[in-house]
Each structure stands twice: as C-alpha cells, then as structure tokens.
C-alpha cells in the first residue's frame, strides 16, 4: 500500500464528535509512552502528523487521522500513566471504553507494547475486550532497535504465550530501523479490502 494522503481530522472527547461517515477504522492502543504517535508518523511517512512527546499522557482525546481517504487511524489515549489525577484517568478510561463500545466502523486494533516490557494488566484487559467483541487485533512490539535478535524472539514467544495468539499476529516494529512498516501496511490493506 502506498500512503498518498494522511490528514488529522480532529480530536474527539465524546461520542458526538466521532466521524459520522462509514469509513473503516483501525485503532492504535497501548500504554502511555509506548510509541503510538511515533508509529503513526513512521508508517504514514509523515514527520509531525501525530504529535510526539516525551511526556507520557500527551494524547488526551481520541485522535482521528484519515488515510488515503479510505480508512481512519484512531489514536486512543495511552493508559496506565501514573502521574495524572484519578479523575483524569477515569475520563481517559471512559473515552476509550465509549469509543470501543460504540464505533460501528472499527475493523482492527493494533495493541502496542514496548518490546522490553512485560504486558501490563491493562494490556490483558484490552486483549480480553478484543476477544469478547470478536475484533481482529495484532500486537506491535515497539522500540525493537533497543534489543538484539534473540531478545526480540524471546519477547515474541512471551507475547504469544501470554495472549494465546500465533506469531503471525505479532509485529516487531522500530521507527529507527524502519522495521515492521510493511507488515502494518499489509494490515491496513486487508482492512480496506474487506
């Protein structure tokens, strides 16, 4: 797939602000600071489409990016960040849950996990939710340039065992080394062909 156009459409803080069209959506979910914005920019070949921050918890609303006028990438707020108020955490959880429960156009989710970390309780909750909703998902192990090949293979095995999924649903991604991009683009392609 060639990325011809990619535009930020807007941030939604409640259901009334979601796009009203029937264009398929792919959600990007994961902990704060796992590299969601970096992945979006890298895969779409755009430098600053999604704002990258070293401060976790930067994405507060649900951000919609329209790609090739054919599908949306939906960037959900990162979860599990300790330094925000309980109130803010509740609001984020509510925003994520509302979107996941109400979107009629959600076709696939990419769950991002730092390749150097164990999956969190929140990651397991997301996987359970995907399974419950019969939503196809893939796990993207980010920051792969920080580990060697054998550590990467161990991380893949661990994810497959933890989530009871096959290795073809795990993508090893590095924005630095530009690995995993073609696999992610293939998922985008499959979604719009369905």
Swiss-Prot record:
Binding-site list for GTP: 30-37, 57-61, 75-78, 142-145, 173-175
A Pfam family that the UniProt record links to this protein: MMR_HSR1
Metal-binding is among the record's keywords: yes
GO biological process terms, semicolon-separated: division septum assembly
Gene that this sequence comes from: engB
Family matches, as SUPFAM superfamilies: P-loop containing nucleoside triphosphate hydrolases
Domain annotation EngB-type G: ranges: 22-194
Similarity comment text for this entry: Belongs to the TRAFAC class TrmE-Era-EngA-EngB-Septin-like GTPase superfamily. EngB GTPase family.
Organism: Caldanaerobacter subterraneus subsp. tengcongensis (strain DSM 15242 / JCM 11007 / NBRC 100824 / MB4)
A cellular component annotation (GO) from this entry: cytosol
Protein name: Probable GTP-binding protein EngB
């Amino acid at each position: 797939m060639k990325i011809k156009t990619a535009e930020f459409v807007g941030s939604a803080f409640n259901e009334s602000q979601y796009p009203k069209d029937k264009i398929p959506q792919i959600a990007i979910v994961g902990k704060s600071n796992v590299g969601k914005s970096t992945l979006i920019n890298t895969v779409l070949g755009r430098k600053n489409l999604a704002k990258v921050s070293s401060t976790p918890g930067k994405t507060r609303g649900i951000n919609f990016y329209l790609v090739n006028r054919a599908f949306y990438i939906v960037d959900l707020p990162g979860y599990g960040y300790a330094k925000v108020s309980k109130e803010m955490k509740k609001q984020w959880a509510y925003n994520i849950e509302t979107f996941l429960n109400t979107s009629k156009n959600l076709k696939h989710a990419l769950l991002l996990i730092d390749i150097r970390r164990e999956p969190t309780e929140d990651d397991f909750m997301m996987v359970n939710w995907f399974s419950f909703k019969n939503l196809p998902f893939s796990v993207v192990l980010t920051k792969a340039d920080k580990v060697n090949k054998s550590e990467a293979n161990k991380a893949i095995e661990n994810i497959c065992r933890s989530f009871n999924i096959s290795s073809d649903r795990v993508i090893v991604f590095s924005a630095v080394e530009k690995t995993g991009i073609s696999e992610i683009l293939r998922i985008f392609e499959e979604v719009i062909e369905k």
